[in-house]
Amino acid sequence: MDVPYDLNSYIRVLKLASTPSTDEFLQVSKIAGAGILLIGFIGFLMFAIMSLLPGVGA
């Protein structure tokens, strides 16, 4: 493990990185939130279907 090389790599990445603008942050947040809601809704549908079918699920 070459510590000076690793530190230089990390510093180079941090220099290139920038904080997102407010619009960019809101767009990413909305997309991530929509994805979380979609996965939750799919899970709920699966649970509901499994609960309604006789002999399947709990």
Swiss-Prot record:
Keywords: Cell membrane, Membrane, Protein transport, Translocation, Transmembrane, Transmembrane helix, Transport. The keyword Transport applies. The keyword Secreted does not apply. One of its GO terms (molecular function) is protein transmembrane transporter activity. It comes from the Archaea. One of its GO terms (biological process) is intracellular protein transmembrane transport. It is a single-pass membrane protein. InterPro entries: Prot_translocase_SecE_dom_sf, Translocase_Sec61-g, Translocase_SecE/Sec61-g. It is found in: Cell membrane. Essential subunit of the Sec protein translocation channel SecYEG. Clamps together the 2 halves of SecY. May contact the channel plug during translocation. Component of the Sec protein translocase complex. Heterotrimer consisting of SecY (alpha), SecG (beta) and SecE (gamma) subunits. The heterotrimers can form oligomers, although 1 heterotrimer is thought to be able to translocate proteins. Interacts with the ribosome. May interact with SecDF, and other proteins may be involved. Belongs to the SecE/SEC61-gamma family. HAMAP family: SecE (MF_00422). This is Protein translocase subunit SecE. It comes from Halorubrum lacusprofundi (strain ATCC 49239 / DSM 5036 / JCM 8891 / ACAM 34). The lineage of its organism: Archaea, Methanobacteriati, Methanobacteriota, Stenosarchaea group, Halobacteria.
